[in-house]
Amino acid sequence: MSRFIIKKSTVLDQFNKIKTLADTVSYSFKTNNHVGYILREETDCFFSIHSIKSLDLLNCPERIIYFAQGWDMKEASHVYNKGVRDFVVDNEKDLQVLLDLQQPLNLMLRMRLKEHTVHTGKHFVFGFYSGTVQKLIPSLHSNQNIEKLGIHVHRKTQNISEWSLKSELENIFPEETLQKIDTINIGGGIPSTYKNFRAEVLEKIFAKITELRDWLHQKDIRMIIEPGRYIAAPSVRLETKILTVYENNIIVDSSIYNGAMDTFVTNIRLLIEGEGEGEPYTIKGKTPDSIDIFRYKAYLKDPKPGDTLTFLNAGAYTYSTDFCGLDPIPVEID
């Protein structure tokens, strides 16, 4: 029977690595809830969330950064009364709802940066334009209910190339605007390793993040980082059982629809433990869907029905669907 196995020590190792880069780490809870529960109990991590249900699941409102999206006064009041004080908004309507609360809080404006590898039509681009942010900051800075004012920026998942944040922010904000900002949240996007993604760029990315943090500290601005995939992916493996092998096809007792939706969403291919030698096989899930494919070609030595086939770095976005009557895959903590 298929199962996800979370290695707690890897979760904590990844957290501790990223913690050295920023003043605050806020884990993107949507990436993998089970990893979030470990971080809640074992670290001082904050959590970036997008729903009241996630707020209730975590039950630590003092460590929540809440992202508003199309909310109303009822939702905003409910979240605030639960104890949340840190908020991110990405449009003026959601901002006005928050201001109408007339309660003390910490606010971050989500700002869009110029994109070079993400195209509208497939991806929605979140955030205020930089000119709008600059117009809003003076009045928000003077608002007595806003205790800390910040900017949130985030490009995309698996961001391997666009990390020149220091130069971008320098070009956007004059010094008088930066003096009114308490916090910069750089979002997530730190890549993980897959068959079709190599993470050799991590050292350069970390150097860019450190450069930004040091520059912000010179201006007395705190930096928040929002890892999700970077912590969750390498902490989890997916163990499946081979049901049958024929004509260089392997059918496993799982499906991308309940075990690897990330395959669709971000076009990644999971690594397989022990691959590299033998014959090429296509690894297919157990549904009748022709695109239920974990890997189009993986070199394996003499796989047999009943063998365990283990996918590595499998912890990001493990949500499931009920397609063809599939059940969620059980999760175990190692």
PLM regions with names:
Residues 115-246:
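Active-site loop/helix belt of alpha/beta enzymes
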Residues 76-82, 114-121:
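Acidic/polar active-site rim loop that often engages polyanionic ligands
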Residues 1-105, 141-147, 178, 303, ...:
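A charged N-terminal "starter" segment
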Residues 28-34, 50-54, 69-71, 90-94, ...:
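Active-site beta-loop-alpha junctions enriched in small/polar residues
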Residues 11, 51, 79, 109, ...:
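Conserved, mostly hydrophobic/aromatic
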Residues 81, 101-102, 118, 185, ...:
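Solvent-exposed alpha-helices and their adjacent loops that cap or buttress functional pockets
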Residues 222-334:
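Charged (often Lys/Glu-rich) extended helix/loop segments that serve as interaction or gating elements
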Residues 47-48, 107, 184, 223:
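Residue-level marker for buried hydrophobic side chains located in beta-strands
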